[in-house]
Amino acid sequence: MSKKKETFTPRANKLKLTTPRRKLKILSSLLDADEDSKMKDQHGYSRVHNDKYRVAKPTQHSTLHESISSRRSSHIHNKSLHEDSARALSWVDSLINRGKSILTTLEKEDALFERSLEEERQRFQLHDSLMNKYTGNSKSHQRLIDLRKSQYGTDTSFQNNDEIPLDSFISSPLPDAEDESSSNIDSDKDEDLEGKQSLIKDFDLENDEYELSEEEKNSDGQSSPSIMILSDEEYAEEGALQDVSNDEYAEEEGQVERKNIGQEQANVENATQISSSDSSEGQNYSEGVEMELEDDIDVESDAEKDESQGAEGTEHSVDFSKYMQPRTDNTKIPVIEKYESDEHKVHQRYSEDGAFDFGSVNISVDDESEDEESQAESYSANAENVYHHNEHELDDKELIEDIESSDSESQSAQESEQGSEDDFEYKMKNEKSTSEETENTSESRDQGFAKDAYTKNKVEQQENDEEPEKDDIIRSSLDKNFHGNNNKSEYSENVLENETDPAIVERENQINDVEGYDVTGKSVESDLHEHSPDNLYDLAARAMLQFQQSRNSNCPQKEEQVSESYLGHSNGSNLSGRSLDESEEQIPLKDFTGENNNNLKTDRGDLSSSVEIEVEKVSEKKLDGSTEKELVPLSTDTTINNSSLGNEDSIYYSLDDADAISENLTDVPLMEIKTTPKYEVVISESVYSSTSYEDNTVAMPPQVEYTSPFMNDPFNSLNDDYEKKHDLLKSTLAALAPAFTKKDAEFVEAGVTKSCLTSTSGHTNIFHTSKETKQVSDLDESTENVTFENENTGDENKNQSKNFPGVANSTDKSTEDNTDEKYFSAINYTNVTGDSSCEDIIETASNVEENLRYCEKDMNEAEMSSGDECVKQNDDGSKTQISFSTDSPDNFQESNDNTEFSSTKYKVRNSDLEDDESLKKELTKAEVVDKLDEEESEDSYEQDYADPEPGNDEGSNENIVKGTKKDTLGIVEPENEKVNKVHEEETLFEANVSSSVNVQNKDMHTDVINQEAQANYEAGERKYYIQNTDTEEAHISIIERIDENAIGNNMEIPERSCVEKTHNEVLFERRATTIENTKALENNTNMHDQVSQACSDSDRDQDSTAEKNVEGSAKHNLDIRVSSSEIESVEPLKPESDRSNIFSSPIRVIGAVVKGVGKVVDVAESFVKKIDVMDSESDDNVDIGDYNQDIFNKSNSTDASVNMKSVSSKERDSDEDEAVILGGVTAEAHNDNGNNSRVINIDPTTNGAYEEDSEVFRQQVKDKENLHKSEEPLVEGLQSEQHFEKKDHSENEEEFDTIYGDITSANIHSNAPDDIKRQQLLKNLSDLENYSQRLIEDSRRGKNQEESDEVNTSRERDLTFEKSVNEKYAGAIEEDTFSELDISIQHPEHEEDLDLSNNQERSIEELNSEPEEAELYELEIEGPTETAASSKMNDDERQRGNIPSTDLPSDPPSDKEEVTDSYPYSNSENITAEKSAPTSPEVYEIFSDTPNEVPMEINDEIPATTLEKHDKTNVTSVLDDRSEHLSSHDVDNEPHDNSINIKVNEGEEPEHQAVDIPVKVEVKEEQEEMPSKSVLEEQKPSMELINDKSSPENNNDEETNREKDKTKAKKKSRKRNYNSRRRKRKITEGSSAASNTKRRRGHEPKSRGQNTHPSVDK
């Protein structure tokens, strides 16, 4: 209670409620003048004064304040009085609150105190319960195990109180219980004991409580209160006993415990009966146990005190659970073999006779360290002293009586339990004396050992003085107990005899038998455990641990000797009395005591007769301790149990085999265990190691090392693929780079340029150009390239279609600035961002010039093998082969052994196209190539035009000239090029493109470096110009469609007028499909090569010099325009940086190369096809308008339009210029001031957005086949469409065929008059022109039929064009796009004009002129061409500049539907348009677009696509005239508020699928006339300029046609009432006459009302 009082002392202080004086203000009067002022601030005042008078009081309740304030407010007249009262009340309230708070705190503290007490009480109870639990276990070793395991935490907590466990446990009657438990007990006995152990637990709890009370009383006397809750008396006595010697302490404890002996004896008797019945090892031991039980409390207290003292001296923290276990074992029942082992140990250590020290103490001391042994001995000595004194204090008779009573009680249980022991009883009787002798010897040795242990224990040296006496007493008591027990109860004697005899006999018989040793050890352990008190049990555990740790068998030998000697008198007899099974069960006790076979060996030397003999036998049997160690029970009690018994320090002792051996359990079968004390660490590979990444490379894609473009040498990577990719890119660039001179190409082929294509894994595609000027031998390069390409092409090809956009996006941005130019010195890298549609194409300008020649049969030399094939022997001897197959990793390969020649092998497989249906469609279109490749004559063009495969949606666009020896560009057929389409299920497209490239400019490296990399950023488009600043020989313009965001993220984009660049740029628009892009790029490359070859076919040798020459040098404008499906929206193209490192990002370079190669092939394919289909696509001139609009969307360059103009004029001058359109690629070669400027306009449009177009294109193909069967109606349809674009379209038609979807035609102009290629182009163009004129004539004859064929659902491929103004135009012009569309489609009357030599003029005139209603009625039939032309003109206008909606005042946004895909006007018309759609895949979608979306530079640009398309048609003059007229007409349309965005949809190719271009045109005829006039006027000068460039004749014709068209357009616009109606026109080629008729009938008034300017039709 002192604690409680102490705890209440501060509480009392708190409870001192004194009047607060600190802030108390004494008022002189209730009415204080100051109060008045204070009351002014009533609320604040109340708070202030409340605080003022508050002294550490809780906050006032608001209610009180409110009451006070209300009270004051109610008595305002008597403020001062109320204030005083309020203050008083507030003070009282604060006082009350304070008192409450104090009380609350006191209550809380009391509750906490009570709770702590309860917790402590529960802890003690738990301790007792655990002790009882473990001591009450049927098996001592199990008890030990449980103790060790479950009591670990508890033990540690108890160990924190070092002295308490000793005191409490010593005072506990555990020694008796241990003595009792020392008797071997069967499982049945254990159960009985467990039943009785509950009583013992209760007894222990009572004792503990009593001891706790004593401890509380004597808390001051004791260094630390025992954890056991003793009564105050017990605790006081224990504290006194601590000061008293161990004997006196034991006596006092005995006296104290004797008070409770009655109860204890009852429990102890039960326990002893159980223990005697269980142990039945000897009445002597049971007597000792009874004595211990009688003195259990005293012994516990004394032993605990002694142990506490010993612990104080030895500083051993004893686990209460451990102590409790032996105590509880003693009290509960020594049933558990843990008792046997523990009590045996404890008894040996704690035995009253001093035998206690014999076993456990000896074990601990000898085994572990002398200190620990001495400590254990001291504990045992203390325990022995206490126990001994207790036993002496308790008369032996009393103890014997108690034991007898317990034995008599336990005999019943033992009889049942010892049914098996009956056999042993005889032996026990016979060997009783022997066991006693052995016990005596063991006792003597134990005494000696205990003495040694005590002597070893410096802390308990004083006790060691008493030890001999104690030992004597212990021996005597043990002997007495042993003999007396044997004499007292015959049954117990019989049991002891039985146990002792069989144990001894077995041990003797098993001197050499390990099992006997184990049995002996078990019995010894059981004896030790049973005899040892709780503290002794713990000490035994400690000793075991020490022994195990020390691994010294001497100590366990001593322990066993002591234990066995002790057992000889007590436990020994019990052990002997135990059956072999019991002894086996006791084996873990041996183990627990740390007595292993080795230990037993050591024990053997120390053990007395029987025990020693047993130990000797065991040791003899176990010559090698390891063998015994190997034989270890599965139980893991050994060290852990021991450690649990011992100090925590001992717990962590070595993992010795001894420990493992000591873990042997009696019941647990022995298992051979390696004698090595340490755990064997088996290091095995991870389960996944064998299947690690190395092994899972097949299952998992190999990690691709990321090559950062920021690396000093991004090409340095662990992968050899990079080098191979370098070679691949090198060869590719060598084949593709037209911008380089032959020397440059040679230099590139020599290895100057190296590229590294990386897979989608994130490897940056790197284009590396070594600075080496050394030219690699053809063979070496071919080999290197072959190897490199073969290895890398597969991955690259697989990824090129997918990766390039993503690869080029972000990394390229930084790589532009970061990559060292030294790696890219050969070629300036332009920062090209990848399109989401994977349409990024950067075409290197190295060898494209020479490699663009495709469609040559020389390419046949390049086998159309898988991408693995890389080397092709070119005619020039150069081994160049580009193998592109997305299927295989080696699909794309390019090697240029010879600088002059490069072969491109392009192979596309269906698997490659699985990702993109549009690609598949395109490839299906490519199937036409086979036929096309086979045919060589120009008739092949006609055939392709007439015989497009229906299955090929855009095959007409891709229809490569069937073996045409003449280049579609007008170039003489490249000798080394071949574009072949393989009709393989796997291989949809395979094209071998080889072009002899004279790479003679070995200074190309520096030249390229000198070449200015100019990037023109235009709305989602990037144009790159590589121009040799030194010689300007090579000018490469690369236009890449990029995301605007990417543009913003990329390097600075200096504003540059598109007009500056379009002159030199090649628009290359690609479809969303990667393969299509690659095909387009490849075709573009091939086209570029073809153009360069066509321009310098014979000048290959001259190219090196001619290109070196400023005049003869060919500026290669490679305008690669990457268009994504998202970019289709018409937006003003932002001028891109005039200069940017062309391939600052090698990724872009590679992507450009690969994609460019593929697309060049595709473009070449479609280019040739378009040449063949060009006439049929003349109907697609309307699509050209859409394409022109796409051009506006994708390029701002008016140069393209100027080039187109010049091309058209030059094409009109068939001697100078030739334009070919393939799959949206128009290649023009024209002389430009003696400079070979090659412009490749490739405009693959994005797919996906218009899948309808593919179907429409298929229908177009079918219709084209029909048209191919019936050319006349086709020609008529062509005439109708070629009114606007026939020549232009014939010039550019194939271009727009590729341009249909969104493909920008590629114009290749060769301006060198001396250039043979240019002459060839002119020749070809002239042929094409003648052919187109012939087609025009045919179209005159069978215009309606052709229109019926022209109106094909293939045109419906762009469903956006839903209504055509004229059914004969086979185009569905939806009113949604234009409220008013002035379709200046010339009537057949105008077609007659077109029949004139100036078909272009007629087309332009028709475009510009508006037919009469009848004419319009007919023109609507012919509408597709005129509409295409007009749309083309609008595109020209848009290229020139954005046509603001104000520019089209006559075309306000129509109230009518603007549905891109819907057919608001009439599905029948659309159907007819689709049905009548000619084979030309071009589909023109007219959508109302905001002027912002339409890039317009009206004065500067004419839609390059229009011009290109016109260039495609041989009638360049018509193109020019038409374009001029369109421009003038567009000028008329400029007033329209809504700019007209027209996309040319190539029905054939999904990539060419036209993206719906909303065109907002006001229906007002006059208004349209005006804008059309303005537009025409603006376009006229540009077209005139172009025509002037082309030829004055063409200019004159164009001017004439322009004037005619202007007047006609005005008429048409006047006649057409748009009434603010927007029309969407989908014009398809090959419209059927019937459908045309239907459209006439259905739309004649509409068309009349909808008479749109041809520019509007654009």
Curated annotation (Swiss-Prot):
Polar residues: compositionally biased ranges: 262-286, 568-577, 800-812, 879-905, 1082-1096, 1197-1207, 1463-1479, 1648-1658
**Record's compositionally biased regions (Basic and acidic residues):** 36-54, 335-352, 386-397, 425-435, 442-461, 471-482, 869-878, 918-931, 1097-1115, 1261-1272, 1335-1366, 1507-1537, 1550-1564, 1575-1591
* Ranges of compositional bias, category Basic residues: 1607-1626
GO BP terms: namely: subtelomeric heterochromatin formation; telomere tethering at nuclear periphery
Spell out the subcellular localization from the entry: Nucleus
Q: Which regions are flagged for Acidic residues bias?
A: 205-214, 245-254, 289-305, 365-375, 398-407, 932-956, 1407-1423
Q: Which residues carry this modification: Phosphoserine?
A: 532, 579, 583, 608, 662, 865-866, 888, 911, 937, 1092, 1096, 1098, 1166, 1176, 1178, 1214, 1254, 1290, 1326, 1332, 1403, 1409, 1450, 1454, 1539, 1590-1591
Which keywords label this protein?
Nucleus, Phosphoprotein, Transcription, Transcription regulation
Q: Where are the transmembrane segments?
A: none
Q: What does the entry list under GO cellular component?
A: chromosome, telomeric region; nuclear periphery
Q: Which residues carry this modification: Phosphothreonine?
A: 500
Q: Does the keyword Lipoprotein apply?
A: no
What InterPro entries is this protein classified in? Leu-rich_rpt
Primary location recorded for the protein, binned into one broad class = nucleus
Q: Where is this region: Disordered?
A: 36-76, 156-499, 550-584, 589-608, 770-819, 863-964, 1082-1115, 1197-1216, 1261-1315, 1334-1482, 1503-1658
Q: Where is the composition biased (Low complexity)?
A: 408-417
Assembly and binders = Interacts with SIR4.
Q: What does this protein do, in the record's words?
A: Involved in the clustering of telomeres at the nuclear periphery, forming discrete subcompartments that accumulate a complex of histone-binding silencing factors like SIR4. Required for SIR4-mediated anchoring and partitioning of plasmids.
The name of this protein is Silent chromatin protein ESC1
Gene (name only): ESC1
